[in-house]
Regions:
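Small-residue (primarily alanine) positions within well-ordered alpha-helices
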Residues: 72-73, 94, 198, 214
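Hydrophobic alpha-helical connector segments
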Residues: 114, 127-158, 210-217
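C-terminal peripheral helix-coil segments that are non-catalytic and often amphipathic
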Residues: 4, 8-56, 143-150, 185-201, ...
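Key DNA-contact positions within bacterial/archaeal DNA-binding proteins
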Residues: 99
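Basic, helix-initiating cap at the start of DNA-binding domains
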Residues: 28-80, 84-93, 110-113
Length: 259
């Protein structure tokens, strides 16, 4: 071959140089597409957890924000009542926009119901569950009333949503009133069960009417709030505790007054 001359290109039989070049380009495109398709599942696999984690963080932040709003709303409701709650007032207290507060509830009514549920949950944690640590019978019944009184003594200054809500929604049928009534019924039913357990264990007279006894005990709490909060009478808590012991003794309970 002469120096400086390029070797002749040899193409497959029946194909021109242009056709071979076209085929090569097709092969290159096919290889690129194949490699991209092979990598895409791996990319999707690694990005999916990232999206889930981001979604989880967003959900957690939203729940924390909603809990903070409910906490602020509960603080307001104990002083101005459930009817005094408004999206605008909460937006001002929390430093959020009205639309931001509204987005977590959708309506003022749903906000009020959320506050009732939060109040009931805290009531259970402070009154009902601690009393369950006591043995069944008189120890548990007395513990339930003692924790109830303890919470009531704090609420003399702040207010009890069960009591104020009953006045606000007495003649307003609807979901908020239902949520309030259901919460009160649930607690009173727990008190009634404790009374019946005392009877079953022989610590109270069998002929004692549990509903009558529950009525009188509940009446003590209502009287305490009226006299201590509205009339500002001193000694109201002591009289309520003494009256509770009288109710138990009248029903046949035997215990040391100092316990």
């Amino acid at each position: 071959m002469p120096t400086g001359c390029k070797p002749p290109r040899i193409y497959p039989r029946g194909l021109s140089g242009r056709q071979v070049l076209s085929q090569n380009r097709t092969h290159v495109r096919f290889i690129c597409i194949s490699m991209s398709a092979t990598r895409s599942p791996r990319t999707a696999h690694t990005s999916a957890p990232t999206r889930r984690q981001a979604s989880g963080r967003t959900l957690q932040k939203g729940q924390q924000t909603k809990a903070a709003i409910i906490d602020a709303a509960l603080g307001l409701a104990t002083h101005i009542g459930l009817e005094g709650l408004s999206i605008g007032a909460l937006a001002e207290v929390t430093g959020m926009s009205k639309s931001g507060v509204f987005a977590h509830f959708g309506s003022r009514e749903e906000l009020q119901i959320s506050v009732v549920r939060e109040y009931h949950q805290r009531f259970e944690q402070e009154v009902f569950y601690p009393a369950l640590d006591e043995p069944r019978g008189l120890p548990r019944l007395r513990a339930m009333f003692a924790y109830w009184m303890k919470r009531s003594s704090v609420e003399i200054d702040s207010g009890c949503i069960y009591i104020s809500g009953a006045i606000e929604f007495d003649e307003q049928p609807g979901p908020v009133r239902d949520a309030l009534a259901d919460s009160v019924r649930e607690w009173l039913a727990a008190m009634r069960r404790a009374i019946v357990q005392c009877q079953e264990m022989g610590q109270l007279h069998a002929q004692t009417d549990p509903d009558q006894m529950l009525f009188e005990i509940h009446g003590l709490i209502l009287a305490l709030h009226y006299e201590a909060r509205f009339l500002r009478k001193e000694g109201s808590i002591e009289r309520a505790l003494a009256s509770f012991d009288h109710i138990l003794r009248r029903a046949g309970a035997q215990f040391d007054a100092a316990t």
